[in-house]
Amino acid sequence: MLNSLDLEGRPQDTRVVVAMSGGVDSSATAALLKSQGYDVVGITLQLYDHGAATHRKGACCAGQDIHDARAVAERIGIPHYVLDYESRFRESVIDSFADSYALGETPVPCIECNRSVKFRDLLATARELGASALATGHYVSSRRLDDGSRALICAADRDRDQSYFLFATTREQLDFLRFPLGDMTKPQTRELARQFGLSVADKHDSQDICFVPTGRYTDVVERLKPNAMEPGEIVDLNGHVLGSHPGIVHFTVGQRRGLGIASRAPLYVLRLDAAHRRVVVGPREALRMERIVLRDVNWIGDGAIDQAVGDGLELFVRVRSTRAPQPAWLRAVGGGYEVELVAGEEGVSPGQACVFYDAADGQARVLGGGFIKSAAPRWSADGVRDDAASPALAAMRG
């Protein structure tokens, strides 16, 4: 007989570690599992030097959060531990964040944190404590498959769905993870927290990168990668110099405001050339990308990825966490993987994730994804389709 977490045994005989960030979501998760009779242990990771972020409204993982998590644990009567992971977090997340920006990318540190810290080290700690599962407050679900493994499923509340940030979860990790809030909305979670008498029921949602206390990511990059602040040229698609800039770290793909150059027509950042310290700008139509080259691909669909992809796999992808899944094709090309966006997408930025889904709506299954290495436009600068860079995609288009 399986319990409500799809685990063998009675709840009272099942230990579950809850990753408690100090926010309402993870707090409600811990309280809910405790009320269902599980043997709950709360763990909070101290990830960075809190400093100026300690009491800033909307910050995540700040010093106040540790206090809040401890207070919730005391309220619901569970043991609570704080683990110092500052060194690991700095090496795995903060340093790579700065490196990525210095390369002209737009990183997603939450994905790296989940992959390199929370779902690796914290999961290992949960096992050492004799837990049968690690539960989090993410808005995402998992479903038990016929073979006993688990599939990652989008949250019922699509406005809160966090599946984009969890695509790098491995199959082994997914089998051990549980997401009790996957079928709930945020208002329902807050109401649940009120029913349990939790002090964080009305706490502000985290909105910022937790280790950027001022809200200015450039401060972090400047401190760790000062070369990213070196000035350079702003050029058009033909290489004509239009102006200068104080450092590529100040720009992102798709940006229009703050370019500091005069033009009769609106110009947008199309590409960041870190090697030459150049910001390439052009018209909005040049932002539309059709082909994406991926790196660090993770597959959590059925079977092996090569068998699933074959000569081409039709699926849906998200290239930003705030965008809806769009139809695409996934293909194996030259020892790696490429995605063709059927309708194209604007503002596809290297460093972001391209996440695979089996459907565009409803509680779709996450099939995996990869990080965007590069993207090619629907049209080249001279108005010709850019098929030459990918023979496989050119053949598919006919």
Swiss-Prot record:
The record marks 138, 352 as: Interaction with tRNA. GO terms for cellular component: cytoplasm. Residues 160-162 are annotated as: Interaction with tRNA. Keywords: ATP-binding, Cytoplasm, Disulfide bond, Nucleotide-binding, RNA-binding, Transferase, tRNA processing, tRNA-binding. SUPFAM superfamilies: Adenine nucleotide alpha hydrolases-like. Disulfide bonds join 113-210. It catalyses: S-sulfanyl-L-cysteinyl-[protein] + uridine(34) in tRNA + AH2 + ATP = 2-thiouridine(34) in tRNA + L-cysteinyl-[protein] + A + AMP + diphosphate + H(+). The keyword tRNA-binding applies. It holds the Pfam family tRNA_Me_trans_M. Its main location: cytoplasm. One of its GO terms (biological process) is tRNA wobble position uridine thiolation. The active site is at residues 113, 210. It comes from the Bacteria. Its EC number is 2.8.1.13. InterPro entries: MnmA-like, MnmA-like_C, MnmA-like_central, MnmA-like_central_sf, Rossmann-like_a/b/a_fold. ATP binds at residues 19-26, 45, 137. It is found in: Cytoplasm. GO terms for molecular function: ATP binding; tRNA binding; tRNA-uridine 2-sulfurtransferase activity. It is an enzyme of class 2 (transferase). Belongs to the MnmA/TRMU family. Catalyzes the 2-thiolation of uridine at the wobble position (U34) of tRNA, leading to the formation of s(2)U34. This is tRNA-specific 2-thiouridylase MnmA. The lineage of its organism: Bacteria, Pseudomonadati, Pseudomonadota, Alphaproteobacteria, Hyphomicrobiales.
